[in-house]
Amino acid sequence: LYLLDKAAVHRYVPAHLSHKSAWVQAESVSSMYLGEQADSLRKMDFIQDINRDGLDDIMLPHFEHLNLWLSDCCGARHPQNLPIAARIEMNQSSVSYDDQEIYFQDMNSDGKTDLVTVEQGQLNVFLQNDDMRFSDTATKIKINKTIHALNWWDIKGENGQEMDQSNIQHRVVREIDDFNGDAIPDIAVQFTKSSGVLDKTIDFEFFYGALKEGKLHYSEQASTSVTSEETLSDLTFLDRDMDGKQEVSVSSFDIGISQIVGALLSGSIDQDVLIFSMDENDKFGKAPLVSQEVEMTFSLSSGTQGQPLATMIDINGDAVKDIVFSDGEDLIRTVLATPDQKNPYAKSSLRQKIPMPKNPYDAVTEDINGDGKTDLVLHYGSADSPELLKRVLVLLAN
């Protein structure tokens, strides 16, 4: 557990024997987070094992560069600056800075993890050297020139205005990883098409990497895609049966006048969680492997909303992930995987009554007791009743 303030990173040392717990300074740092006192705590991934040596490194954005503190085997950290500037946005009376998305992948097949950023039409790769530091100059890899690093609503025109929603065709990178199990990084892209505020379609495209003369290359056309007649969102990846190929989980919902009116009257909106898998040619199927309906709730009076729990974990230790999802405010269901290729999931679900958090988005899935089955830890938040705020719910698979 680490804590960042204006000038330092602190590490939490738990109590042990006669020693009390304490916060100790781990490193003096500089970053663009310059506030003297924060109004609230925020979770950030500024501690990473960047060079995959098993040691905690520090990564913090500054206004004009990215600051790294790389750990060595003796406990020291070595600083390095990379020319990765924060993104600046200027309005009439304010200026804001956002850090760039950083991806960690081996981009030249040398067994070392490299740092990757995206700009329109290309990847910028900071290769890791033999001394575990990174090159100060980026190697550029061309990708489809319509692929962006930013969402369409973050892109401003020459006059400073946002994009016209009556005519949007926009691709943005959502993930860089090896999806088809060939040890070569691939690119997942969200493709948004819009002819109006209520007339949007969102698909996901996948550009598989290939080696040509020893160098990483991406084609102009997507290798495969996940599509639906409804709007897709919440792209996540999982290896359902541990075969090295990633399945895709997306949420699907319909946006229209009738759906909006119905949601306002009922205080909830139905959405489907769809799981797509690859075939033997690394193509995603047109139909999902499985579809599960869940419900999202909201309150116009309080301004709060409730997100459903929907995750895939192996709860019975058979090395195949099962589906776990919430059903209302006090029920959790589990659909077990089956060995049947035509019907990969059971038709009925297991049920358990528990007081579900309104927003279980930060649910932790880990094998807590080492029995080979994945357990579930749920946290309550501000949308839940006051008596639940100090509780943590631990569900052990059995």
Functional labels for PLM-detected ranges:
Residues L1-N398:
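Beta-propeller-forming repeat regions
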